């Protein structure tokens, strides 16, 4: 209180649109963490635009990004974007379960009149595991809650269906990265609402051209897995470089596919142009000459009624080069032997 009483007002300082606003470090699969630079002007323009175009929020709405300010979601959608749009933003310290129970998110939504929640699929998998019938949800008034957005990892169709059935509201999977600062692909709720396809973040957001390329740098046909890349130039708000590492920026993102930004994600487009993010490019495994997506296999495992969470990795095999190895976490209250569930999912794959 004493320090606050002695504090003097600080004037606003004009800065160039291209001046750095912040540096956010993100880990790479190899080497040192990369310091993603965010500039002032493009960042503000892009975030302000997304609040209506993507998230369909208006000034005065209550917006909740259940993330951490140390992550890009926290920077973009706890701090900057909601305030630029004139929304109330919620900063929440807690978990979706255990604080005190799996109704924590519903309590916050009801108490503060949240219109739009943005969180990770893991949060809903945790809620589903602890409260599979969504009984705690029914204790709260969610009448002002309109849309759930999921991002940060691939949303498996089983989690999306569970959330849709429980909430009876749109559940929107969308996709972006620390480097981009705002969504690359989404069903834009404030523009044109496309039919939802489970497993897909829908289509590229205006400003982005997203192509799927093969190792020869050619665009692949629909349904073929390849490297997901964004055509240059990138839209406002994306990273202009890495902090004190211009050459590393070029080598990491621009060199492999000339004329494109390499996302390092793998996936495909369907015949309707919907994008499917299946895995990081280093999560595509080669089994006896066949390129297989661990994400596609995880999707099958997650569809088993007893499975709450799962993961698939590639392990070395003397005959086939690699073989998939799956890990399962069962839902609370499951009585079946884990060996029986394992046999089920092997047959499903």
Q: What residue spans do the PLM features occupy?
A:
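Gly/Ser/Thr-rich phosphate-binding loop
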Residues: 59, 87, 115-119, 128-195, ...
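Conserved AMP-binding/adenylation subdomain of ANL enzymes
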Residues: 44-62, 72-116, 129-136
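Conserved pre-ATP/AMP-binding loop-to-beta segment of ANL
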Residues: 2-25, 32, 47, 56-62, ...
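AMP-binding/adenylate-forming catalytic core of the ANL superfamily
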Residues: 110, 117, 230, 234, ...
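Conserved ATP/PPi-binding loop(s) of AMP-dependent carboxylate-activating enzymes
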Residues: 203-207, 218-253, 292
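Adenylate-forming
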Residues: 33-35, 46-53, 106, 124-131, ...
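Active-site glycine-centered loops adjacent to acidic/histidine catalytic or metal-binding residues
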Residues: 68, 152, 176, 202, ...
